[in-house]
């Protein structure tokens, strides 16, 4: 029996554009970063039994992204041992932060290494779990398109590091619900053929971009609009935007001191919001 401790970082979509839809999936373009908010997973290989335990008891222990990973990877391994995963949930659930995908990717990385499964196989299997899982396998700044499987890593992109994350308490928002109700008057035009080369051009793109799912998310959680309005009023806020399918929002800052001012004020004045600092990895 072997035990491993792994971390799964939360994801932020700096922008999210929807380009179209086929019979099953939406096609998208998104710039993703990962931040220092982690779920902590204890993975026991060759355990007495297989299973998953979450500190957040609202998550289905028997049908979730981790159980799917264990099943899929066991089909590509000669190992037939039990795997048990205990998860300390720090990433908000159903909040646009890809907590389930991050957990799945963390387990995939570990089991792929222990069971000697090729990275290309892991990337193919990741998409079977969810559209954010391929990006979460990398957990680095990247540009994703398609369903999320077409990934361009951006190791040299230097972004503002400090993020204030705000979510309305008790307002989880299902990704499936938002996408199923997304009915745009027109889809966004692709930018993938003309991606920026210079640092300043990337920053300009980020500032002028958007989250195409915002209007749909507002139908279910109108409070998102107030959160964004409040964040944008703070000094030196570069952008304020919703991440993923919501309802979590973020504000981006160059200086930690500016972000700390926002967190202190909102934690004192808005007990109905979850507010905390984060840093881009």
Swiss-Prot record:
One of its GO terms (biological process) is terpenoid biosynthetic process. InterPro entries: GHMP_kinase_C_dom, GHMP_kinase_C_sf, GHMP_kinase_N_dom, IspE, Ribosomal_Su5_D2-typ_SF, Ribsml_uS5_D2-typ_fold_subgr. ATP binds at residues 92-102. It is an enzyme of class 2 (transferase). It catalyses: 4-CDP-2-C-methyl-D-erythritol + ATP = 4-CDP-2-C-methyl-D-erythritol 2-phosphate + ADP + H(+). Pathway: Isoprenoid biosynthesis; isopentenyl diphosphate biosynthesis via DXP pathway; isopentenyl diphosphate from 1-deoxy-D-xylulose 5-phosphate: step 3/6. Its EC number is 2.7.1.148. Keywords: ATP-binding, Isoprene biosynthesis, Kinase, Nucleotide-binding, Transferase. The keyword Nucleotide-binding applies. Pfam families: GHMP_kinases_C, GHMP_kinases_N. One of its GO terms (molecular function) is 4-(cytidine 5'-diphospho)-2-C-methyl-D-erythritol kinase activity. The active site is at residues 11, 132. Belongs to the GHMP kinase family. IspE subfamily. Catalyzes the phosphorylation of the position 2 hydroxy group of 4-diphosphocytidyl-2C-methyl-D-erythritol. This is 4-diphosphocytidyl-2-C-methyl-D-erythritol kinase. It comes from Ehrlichia ruminantium (strain Welgevonden). The gene is ispE.
């Amino acid at each position: 029996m072997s035990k491993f401790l792994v971390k799964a970082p939360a994801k932020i979509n700096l922008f999210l554009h929807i380009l179209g839809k086929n019979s099953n999936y939406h096609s998208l373009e998104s710039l993703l970063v990962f931040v220092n908010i982690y779920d902590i997973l204890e993975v026991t290989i060759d355990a007495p039994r297989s299973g998953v335990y979450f500190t957040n008891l609202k998550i289905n222990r028997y049908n979730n992204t981790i159980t799917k990973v264990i099943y899929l990877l066991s089909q590509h391994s000669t190992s037939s041992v039990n795997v048990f995963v205990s998860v300390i949930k720090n990433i908000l659930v159903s909040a646009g932060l890809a907590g389930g995908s991050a957990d799945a990717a963390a387990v995939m990385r570990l089991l792929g290494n222990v069971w000697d499964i090729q990275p290309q196989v892991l990337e193919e299997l990741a998409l079977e779990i969810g559209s954010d899982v391929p990006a979460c396998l990398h957990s680095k700044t990247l540009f994703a398109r398609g369903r999320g499987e077409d990934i361009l890593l951006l190791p040299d992109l230097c972004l503002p590091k400090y993020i204030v994350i705000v979510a309305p308490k008790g307002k989880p928002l299902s990704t499936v619900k938002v996408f199923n109700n997304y009915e745009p008057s027109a889809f966004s035009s692709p930018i993938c053929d003309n991606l920026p080369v210079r640092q300043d051009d990337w920053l300009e793109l980020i500032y002028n971009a958007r989250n195409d799912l915002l209007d749909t998310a507002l139908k279910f959680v109108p409070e998102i609009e107030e959160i964004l309005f409040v964040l944008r009023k703070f000094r030196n806020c570069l952008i304020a935007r919703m991440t993923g399918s919501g309802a979590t929002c973020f504000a981006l800052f160059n200086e930690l001191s500016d972000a700390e001012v926002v967190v202190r004020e909102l934690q004192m004045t808005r007990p109905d919001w979850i507010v905390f600092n984060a840093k881009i990895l």
